[in-house]
């Protein structure tokens, strides 16, 4: 199936469901408590992440779509933390505050990558009047192309049928990530996205592919669904619609590091693609590709349009191309396990020219893998002025990633990549121009880790500034 990315910016999606805050306390354990036979964790890092339905909304927003989120919270620090974290990624929150209940919070204590304990702070929202949620849905319907109901059985979706009916009257597709075995609650939905175990909890264990398809088709008919998407982990996904042959999408994950939140990514990308105008089949294809990306990351994660573009082109499967920092760290670790020498350079690369290509080819010859760190648009403006860059970040990275000499491309927001270099610690740091090695950002960190720093010459007479001036003078 040949699928192109839609313009997610014109997609509006409302997510309604059980929102929660995931808290993580990290620290070393050096002794056993004298009070009880338990380890003492000296907490040195605290992290907070939106979870549940909030993670679905984050996945939608990460694509550039307009994500709205409705859910139930308390009036407490956890609710404020959720709103703060979500506003940072442009999710529009419209929570219903319930003063008698705490915001659902899950606190995990970890040491040396091991979870020692999880503490859940929740009472559930059973019995809470759903009318304010209905009102928020009604107000949002004219502005959205899809409604997602994210059910974690915490009470926000206890009255799900009126929500489905509101959307159907407005001709807005309803996508549901179900919970439990009572699918009668979801009658009339456009699409359900159960995983295999959730599906088999309703229809019984399926011995083979034929049995899965037959029982799935029966479920679609019984509950008046438009479609059913069964996510099947390493076996991919299967889309079932009455009157159409089943569509099986094999997994695109090359390596699996963490499946946390993969279901949220699937329904988030699927809804955003539908709202942007893609067909259901095309949207499922994109959701499957996105799932293949996020399971290669650690922890609950989202996928960017660039990552999704790479995935559907097949580059993500090879472990190369445009990446975020987390993906890059994993790729570099794997390269080092293979005994490969990692070279890193950086720049704006606004209008790629022969000098750039020659420089990058020479840098690549110095090792086995080449990382190119690229200034963001905001960083470029600060360094070069308001009229730069000529080409936006995404286009600059895609062009660089297409070069044979370049293995990995990663963006950075700061004026220099010093922090990024300190995190990656390449074996060789390279910079072009008339710098002295000690003047190069990140050189001290690389030297301290036992690495090398080298300056390469640029091709004389070729520069982005000269090209821009030639165009202005009418010689381009």
From Swiss-Prot:
Top EC class for this record: transferase
Transmembrane stretches, start-end: none
Q: Cytidylyltransferase: where is this region?
A: 344-476
In terms of domain of life, where is this protein from?
Bacteria
Gene Ontology cellular-component annotations: cytosol
What EC designation does it have?
2.7.1.167, 2.7.7.70
Extract the Pfam families matched here.
CTP_transf_like (PF01467), PfkB (PF00294)
Give the UniProt keywords, A-Z.
ATP-binding, Carbohydrate metabolism, Kinase, Lipopolysaccharide biosynthesis, Multifunctional enzyme, Nucleotide-binding, Nucleotidyltransferase, Transferase
- Name the reaction it catalyses: D-glycero-beta-D-manno-heptose 7-phosphate + ATP = D-glycero-beta-D-manno-heptose 1,7-bisphosphate + ADP + H(+); D-glycero-beta-D-manno-heptose 1-phosphate + ATP + H(+) = ADP-D-glycero-beta-D-manno-heptose + diphosphate
Question: What are the boundaries of the region Ribokinase?
Answer: 1-318
Q: Where does ATP bind?
A: 195-198
Q: Which residues form the active site?
A: 264
Query: Any idea which GO molecular function terms this record carries?
Result: ATP binding; heptose 7-phosphate kinase activity; heptose-1-phosphate adenylyltransferase activity; phosphotransferase activity, alcohol group as acceptor
Question: Between which residues do disulfide bridges form?
Answer: none
Subunit-structure text:
Homodimer.
Family as reported in the entry's similarity comment: In the N-terminal section; belongs to the carbohydrate kinase PfkB family. In the C-terminal section; belongs to the cytidylyltransferase family.
Q: Which HAMAP family match?
A: HldE (MF_01603)
Briefly state the protein's biological role.
Catalyzes the ADP transfer from ATP to D-glycero-beta-D-manno-heptose 1-phosphate, yielding ADP-D-glycero-beta-D-manno-heptose.
Q: What is this protein called?
A: Bifunctional protein HldE
Q: What is the lineage of its organism?
A: Bacteria, Pseudomonadati, Pseudomonadota, Gammaproteobacteria, Enterobacterales
* Gene expressing this chain: hldE
């Amino acid at each position: 199936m040949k699928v192109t990315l839609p313009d997610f910016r014109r997609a509006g999606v409302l997510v309604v469901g059980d929102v929660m805050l995931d808290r993580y306390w990290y620290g070393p354990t050096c002794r056993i408590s004298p009070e009880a036979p338990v380890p003492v964790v000296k907490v040195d890092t605290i992290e907070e992440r939106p979870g549940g339905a909030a993670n679905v909304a984050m996945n939608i927003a990460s694509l550039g779509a307009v994500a709205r989120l409705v859910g139930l919270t308390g009036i407490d620090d956890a609710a404020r933390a959720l709103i703060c974290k979500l506003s940072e990624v442009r999710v529009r929150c419209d929570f219903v505050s319930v003063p008698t209940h705490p915001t659902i919070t899950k606190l995990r204590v970890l040491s040396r990558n091991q979870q020692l304990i999880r503490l859940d702070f929740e009472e559930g929202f059973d019995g809470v009047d759903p009318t304010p949620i209905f009102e928020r849905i009604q107000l949002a319907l004219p502005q959205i192309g899809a409604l997602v109901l994210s059910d974690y059985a915490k009470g926000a979706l206890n009255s799900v049928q009126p929500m489905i009916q509101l959307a159907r009257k407005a001709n807005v597709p309803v996508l549901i990530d179900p919970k439990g075995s009572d699918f009668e609650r979801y009658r009339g939905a456009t699409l359900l996205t159960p995983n295999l175990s959730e599906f088999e909890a309703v229809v019984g264990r399926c011995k083979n592919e034929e049995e899965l398809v037959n029982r799935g088709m029966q479920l679609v008919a019984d509950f008046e669904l438009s479609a059913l998407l069964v996510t099947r982990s390493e076996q991919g996904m299967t889309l079932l619609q009455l009157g159409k042959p089943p569509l099986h999408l094999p997994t695109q994950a090359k390596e699996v590091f963490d499946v946390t939140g993969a279901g949220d990514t699937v329904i988030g990308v699927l809804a955003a693609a539908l709202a942007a105008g893609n067909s259901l089949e095309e949207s499922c294809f994109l959701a499957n590709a996105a799932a293949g990306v996020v399971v290669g990351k650690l922890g609950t994660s989202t996928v960017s349009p660039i990552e999704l573009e790479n995935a559907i082109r097949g580059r993500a499967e090879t472990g190369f191309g445009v990446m975020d920092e987390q993906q890059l760290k994993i790729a570099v670790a794997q390269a080092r396990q293979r005994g490969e020498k990692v070279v890193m350079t950086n720049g704006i690369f606004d209008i790629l020219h022969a000098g750039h290509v020659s420089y990058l080819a020479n840098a690549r010859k110095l090792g086995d893998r080449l990382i190119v760190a690229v200034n963001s648009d905001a960083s470029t403006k600060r360094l070069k002025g308001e009229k730069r860059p000529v080409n936006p970040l995404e286009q600059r990275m895609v062009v660089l990633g297409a070069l044979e000499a370049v293995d990995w491309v990663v963006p950075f927001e700061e004026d220099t990549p010093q922090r990024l270099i300190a995190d990656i610690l390449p074996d060789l740091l390279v910079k072009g121009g008339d710098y002295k090695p000690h003047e190069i950002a990140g050189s001290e960190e690389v030297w301290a880790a036992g690495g090398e720093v080298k300056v390469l010459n640029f091709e004389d007479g070729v520069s982005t500034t000269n090209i821009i001036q030639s165009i202005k003078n009418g010689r381009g």
